[in-house]
């Protein structure tokens, strides 16, 4: 399983984003919720980031992936200068991975994974939870032999890309949730020719097995607002390592099955946030 932070909105400088990444590093290094729920206190199976900056109709992007543990690498040194250069519209997704048992640990399976949609757009995904990989193979048009090199998130993103053209709709996400095994805390970014479509949210299955309390503590996602910037973060990041810029009163837990969609245009315009309440 994994820890992640996401951001969307407008920034004057990247310091808040840098500090949020630092908190993610701490959460990946020592995760009390992971220890409680999965007996995993570290997320050491690679990390990655997608950062998109839009200013004056100019778009810049950084996509980085590494199989090193995020807390043994230098994420602030690698992506920090880019974050600090941002001065307007931004989308950020940063992910620290703890691979599920039996899943490959390689650069292909390190998030954010990438695919090309039917319409020629780029589709990126980060994910905490697991999909039923076998059920997605046909939709992804991938053989079992080839699929063995990739994790469930890669196959899920590829299957979603095969389904869509140049946007991610509510029905598309509902379809994807029908293939969830344990949970789908997600960040999805679709990069089109003149806009970015971004979705963030949380879903996890409750099993009534006496462990739903620990399950909720592990899977819950916070939404925090700082000026014109909205940050989404895994529970450990906020409950145990909350950055000083993220006031507790400005953070809330999003509902199980709640997803938010944003559309950001290359001219700097941002459309009003859409809220989707989905269930299986």
Language-model-derived ranges and their functions:
Residues 1-280:
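N-terminal segments that mediate ammonia production and transfer
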């Amino acid at each position: 399983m994994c820890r992640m932070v996401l951001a969307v909105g407008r920034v004057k400088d990247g310091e808040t984003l840098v500090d949020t990444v630092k908190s993610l590093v701490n959460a990946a290094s020592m995760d009390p919720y992971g220890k409680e729920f999965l007996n995993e206190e570290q997320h050491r199976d690679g990390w990655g980031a997608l950062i998109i900056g839009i200013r004056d109709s100019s778009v810049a992007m950084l996509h980085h992936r590494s199989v090193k543990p995020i807390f043994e690498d230098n994420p602030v040194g690698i992506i920090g200068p880019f974050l600090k250069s941002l001065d307007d519209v931004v989308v950020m997704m940063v992910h620290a991975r703890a691979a599920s048992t039996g899943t490959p640990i390689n650069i292909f399976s390190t998030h954010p994974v990438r695919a090309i949609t039917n319409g020629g757009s780029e589709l990126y995904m980060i994910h905490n939870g697991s999909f039923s990989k076998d059920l997605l193979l046909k939709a992804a048009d991938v053989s079992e032999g080839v699929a063995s090199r990739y994790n469930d998130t890669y196959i899920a993103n590829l299957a979603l890309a095969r389904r869509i053209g140049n946007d991610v709709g509510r029905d598309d996400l509902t379809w994807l949730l029908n293939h969830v095994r344990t949970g789908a805390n997600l960040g999805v970014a679709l990069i089109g020719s003149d806009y970015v479509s971004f979705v963030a949210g949380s879903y996890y299955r409750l099993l009534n097995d006496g462990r739903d309390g620990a399950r909720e503590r592990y899977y819950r996602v916070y939404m925090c607002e700082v000026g014109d910037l909205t940050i989404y973060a895994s529970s450990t990041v906020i409950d145990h390592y909350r950055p000083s810029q993220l006031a507790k009163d400005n953070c809330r837990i999003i509902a199980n099955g709640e997803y938010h969609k944003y559309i950001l245009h290359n001219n700097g315009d941002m459309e009003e946030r859409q809220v989707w309440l989905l269930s299986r």
